[in-house]
Amino acid sequence: MELKLAREDLNSKPKTITLEQIEEMVKKSGDKIFYFDRENSHKDLMELVEYFENKGYSVYFREVKYGLDENDYIYEVHILA
């Protein structure tokens, strides 16, 4: 599964990351915070949460609004060992 990381600039394209890369980063540090772009489907992000919960991690997921526009949001995912 490929997910798009949050954009660093409004005009830039989001970078992608795979589930395997996320898992590797979490294994190295024990816990990690990821910010995902709004272009990701909610279903894919729920699959990510479920995947790590099944592996025994605590996962916190929320939508973060950063502006007044309806489309000004990103997804925040905390994965804790």
Model-based region annotation:
Residues M1-H42:
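An N-terminal amphipathic alpha-helical segment
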Residues M25-K27, E50, L68-E70:
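Sterically constrained small-residue positions within well-ordered secondary structures
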Residues L45-N54:
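Short, aromatic/basic amphipathic alpha-helical patches
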Residues K43-D44, Y60:
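Amphipathic alpha-helical interaction segments
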Residues Y57:
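Short phosphate-binding/catalytic loops that engage adenosine nucleotides
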Residues Y60-A81:
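C-terminal edge-of-domain segments
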